[in-house]
Amino acid sequence: MTISVIVPCFNEEESIPLFHEAMEAVKYKIRDQFEYIFVNDGSTDQTLPVLRELSSRCPDVHYLSFSRNFGKEAALYAGLQEASGDFVTVMDVDLQDPPELLVEMKAMLDSNPELDCVGTRRTTREGEPPIRSFFANLFYKLINKISQVEMVDGARDFRLMRRQMVEAILEVSEYNRFSKGI
């Protein structure tokens, strides 16, 4: 089995080596093959040269590079299109998403074949500036009022999906997506 790790990057030259090192320390606990798909979203720093160098040293590291910044959703979609793994995870390169959780997420999917996805959610806004917390809460209240699909407050992009879920997402025809709502 292979796990594709999709990592959107925008001006993350310093975070990339730290992320890769942290993931390498965790992947041996899972025992599946890994492929990393970094998506450079039009960075203006040294993100692209860092990705080139890492890819030249590590055969399981691949990257895509956008000519300009198209946004995280476009980067995620491009990564999903490129991923070939039996399982696919989406992670932030700045280690907001603890790589150790991937071990638990994979174990949960392995022991529950009826599940297509295991996701994460933020349970507290502690440490967040009050104004950001206010607008985040307001966003979820508004979106749940106008949408037919309920969004869980604190939903994160960090999730582990089976291939069949990825294929279903790729079939969604909407151009402007919000992956936390999928």
Question: Language-model features: where?
Answer:
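Cell-envelope/extracellular polymer assembly enzymes that use nucleotide-activated donors
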Residues: 2-4, 35
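Structural signature of the Rossmann-like NAD(P)-dependent dehydrogenase/reductase core
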Residues: 4, 40-43, 65
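Short, well-formed alpha-helical segments that are part of the catalytic scaffolds
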Residues: 12-27
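Alpha-helical transmission elements in cytosolic ATPase-linked domains
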Residues: 18, 22, 46, 50-53, ...
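Conserved donor nucleotide-binding strand/loop of the catalytic core
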Residues: 34-38, 48-82
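A conserved acidic beta->alpha catalytic loop
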Residues: 40-49, 95-96
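Acceptor/aglycone-binding surface of glycosyltransferases and processive sugar-polymer synthases
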Residues: 64-68, 72-82, 87, 99-181
